[in-house]
Amino acid sequence: MAKLTYNIPKDYTVIDLETTGTSPAKSEIIEIACLKYRNGEQVEAIQQLVRPRRRISYFIQNFTGITNEMVADAPMIEEVLPAISACLQGETIVGHNVNFDMNFLKAQGVNFDGWYLDTLYLSRKLLKNVSCHKLEYLCDYFGIVDTHHRAASDCLMTNELMYRLASLPEYQKLSAM
């Protein structure tokens, strides 16, 4: 079973998925990104579009910017999972609402029982005066600029958000617990 931490890890992997919906039982992964960091420096990146079995809805195409044409020649999820599993093996996982991503990966047979840090949970603990804790709103709050709803850019923003949250005075109290 995965274990939540609030301590910023020295070595970690930031993950993000783009999917066709919110249910791992009914929806499919259409993009995966894993950015591996050592001592705060990115040392490895996997970004992969994934071809779903069903067409991507117009809503999801507009939301993610990922079209059916973009994934037409992409590998199926079964072809991508070995590299993703290897990238996550033994890592502390960082993500924004990372349980969402881990549940999709678990539904595909990727098991994870290490530590994870969720910037969504961390932001809710530290920014009680902020009403919305979605990644794009928190990035606006901290002045972090990038495109949204693509897996690799969301990983980069999540990584920066983690450090911005850790720089808050309230974080020192939380991490000491």
Can you say where each PLM-predicted feature lies in the sequence?
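Acidic two-metal-ion nuclease catalytic site recognized across multiple nuclease folds
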Residues: 1-7, 159-177
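Acidic donor-binding loop at a coil-to-helix junction in glycosyltransferase catalytic cores
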Residues: 153
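Short, contiguous clusters of charged residues that form electrostatic/catalytic patches at enzyme active sites
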Residues: 79-82, 156, 160
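Conserved non-catalytic scaffold segment of RNase H-like nuclease domains
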Residues: 1-115, 128-149
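Short, acidic/small-residue loops that bind anionic groups at enzyme active sites
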Residues: 113-123
